[in-house]
């Protein structure tokens, strides 16, 4: 599949989707984009910058949601112009899709909305690449129906994203079998390594997380053989206004990406490993 200006597939070198969970300020957006662009250029990893102008799914009504549509899109446009990087952002049921699609390069649908047929159809009908997150409540084989709905719009630029499955209360588990199953649906598969360690509502009025397991799961997904890795990162996760508990410190991204690139190269170029994946 052609994604912006590079080819993506489950057997091609992986690409990265990364950035802060939510746009907190113009400075934070530009700073994280600059650091990530420098690292990915050095490691030759195709990079898509992500951040949200509005986080609709929040544990508490008092939680920070973002800077809003107009300011958020202005900042994303500035990131795109300043660093020449493609942009991904979330859209929701009442998002003015035309306005967002005029700025960003990839649209992302939230996991909780993956079964909403009209929503998925409207987003995919924009003709932009779409990253569809698998619901925490959904079996991986059920995503083939979501792919069919999406591609029925005529849009072939559809990706599937695994972000963990509900495992009792306030917990998620990442089942690597899900990646293998979804790879059979003729769509690039992305693994969300940071939301997969989230503890939804685990802190009462906010979600917790176990960021120490992000590198473990990211390496496991790369070993399975995926098209892309999604990770949220922040210079100071403890001060992040959304999902800090499961965000990777920005200072740790270089080392982790070096590991992932080395493993990805092994899995996708070694003939024996290619047979296993």
UniProtKB/Swiss-Prot annotation:
This is 2-dehydro-3-deoxyphosphooctonate aldolase. Its EC number is 2.5.1.55. Pathway: Carbohydrate biosynthesis; 3-deoxy-D-manno-octulosonate biosynthesis; 3-deoxy-D-manno-octulosonate from D-ribulose 5-phosphate: step 2/3; Bacterial outer membrane biogenesis; lipopolysaccharide biosynthesis. It holds the Pfam family DAHP_synth_1. InterPro entries: Aldolase_TIM, DAHP1/KDSA, KDO8P_synthase. It comes from the Bacteria. Belongs to the KdsA family. It is an enzyme of class 2 (transferase). One of its GO terms (molecular function) is 3-deoxy-8-phosphooctulonate synthase activity. One of its GO terms (biological process) is keto-3-deoxy-D-manno-octulosonic acid biosynthetic process. It is found in: Cytoplasm. PANTHER family: PHOSPHO-2-DEHYDRO-3-DEOXYHEPTONATE ALDOLASE. Keywords: Cytoplasm, Lipopolysaccharide biosynthesis, Transferase.
């Amino acid at each position: 599949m052609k994604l912006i200006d590079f080819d993506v597939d489950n057997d091609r070198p992986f690409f990265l989707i990364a950035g802060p969970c939510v746009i907190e300020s113009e400075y934070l957006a530009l700073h994280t984009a600059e650091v990530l662009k420098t690292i990915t250029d050095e490691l030759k990893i195709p990079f898509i910058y992500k951040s949200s102008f509005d986080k609709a799914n929040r544990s508490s009504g008092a939680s920070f949601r973002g800077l809003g549509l107009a300011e958020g899109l202005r900042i994303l446009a500035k990131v795109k112009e300043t660093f020449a990087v493609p942009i991904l952002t979330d859209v929701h049921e009442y998002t003015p899709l035309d306005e967002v699609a005029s700025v960003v390069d990839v649209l992302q649908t939230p996991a909780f909305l993956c079964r909403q047929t009209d929503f998925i159809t409207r987003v995919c009908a924009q003709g932009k690449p779409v990253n569809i997150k698998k619901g925490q409540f959904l079996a991986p084989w059920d995503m083939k129906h979501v792919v069919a709905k999406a591609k029925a719009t005529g849009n072939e630029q559809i990706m599937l994203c695994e972000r963990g499955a509900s495992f009792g209360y306030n917990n998620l588990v990442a089942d690597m079998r899900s990646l293998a199953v979804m790879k059979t649906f003729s769509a690039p598969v992305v693994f969300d390594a940071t939301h997969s360690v989230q503890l939804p509502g685990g802190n009462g009025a906010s979600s917790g997380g176990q960021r120490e397991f992000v590198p473990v799961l990211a390496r496991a997904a790369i070993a399975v053989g995926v098209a892309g890795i999604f990770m949220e990162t922040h210079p100071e996760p403890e001060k992040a206004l959304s999902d800090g508990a499961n965000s990777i410190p920005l200072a740790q991204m270089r080392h982790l990406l070096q590991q992932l690139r080395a493993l990805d190269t092994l899995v996708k170029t070694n003939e024996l490993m290619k047979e296993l994946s």
